[in-house]
Amino acid sequence: MQGLIHLYCGDGKGKTTAAVGLSVRAAGAGKRVLFAQFLKDGSSSELNVLRALQNVEVACCTQNFGFFKAMDGQTKAAAQKAYSALLEDVMRKSADGVDLFVLDEAVAACNHGLIEEATLIDFLHGRPKALEVVLTGRDPSQHLLDAADYVTEMRKRKHPFERGIAARRGIEF
């Protein structure tokens, strides 16, 4: 079976949730899943479920660099080194019998220069034929849009944050 590329993008809620849902579905069908998370420290609630499933490996950077806008130059350099190493590691692992490879927030990591988009594009074009790949994040480049077989855009119409309601554990993270 030919693996396809999914891109979940947009300013709305649900990109990671959709990727988690597909991961659960794939694991339920006996497929091996590699779920890599960028720009997050691995403490999101949905990862607890993924870690409990057979056939699912979760990879993330254990260091928390904070929000990109608040990073100084030294922190950005450290984040770039850590996320680039994570990308190289998970790309290598994905060739070892993985059926579904999720790169959560890889689009944002590219946009902030924390991983090289060219490296990601080269991987997508040279990946194992049967490997299904999911990318998530806001504002994908035209190169990523062109590489994708599915593009799903989540659009925000209204969000509680606009009324001062903070993100809630178990709902938004």
Regions from the PLM with identified roles:
Residues 25, 49, 123, 143-144:
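Hydrophobic/aromatic ligand-binding patch that stacks against planar heteroaromatic rings
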Residues 22, 48-51, 73, 115-119, ...:
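Short, glycine/charged-enriched secondary-structure capping and boundary segments
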Residues 136:
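Conserved D-loop beta-strand region of ABC ATPase nucleotide-binding domains
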Residues 4-92:
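Conserved P-loop
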Residues 139-173:
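Phosphate-binding/switch region of NTP-binding enzymes
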Residues 33, 133, 151:
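Hydrophobic anchor at the start of a short beta-strand
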Residues 70-132:
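Phosphate-binding/switch loop-helix module in NTP-utilizing enzymes
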Residues 39-42, 64-65, 107-108, 139-142, ...:
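Conserved nucleotide-binding/hydrolysis micro-motifs of P-loop NTPases
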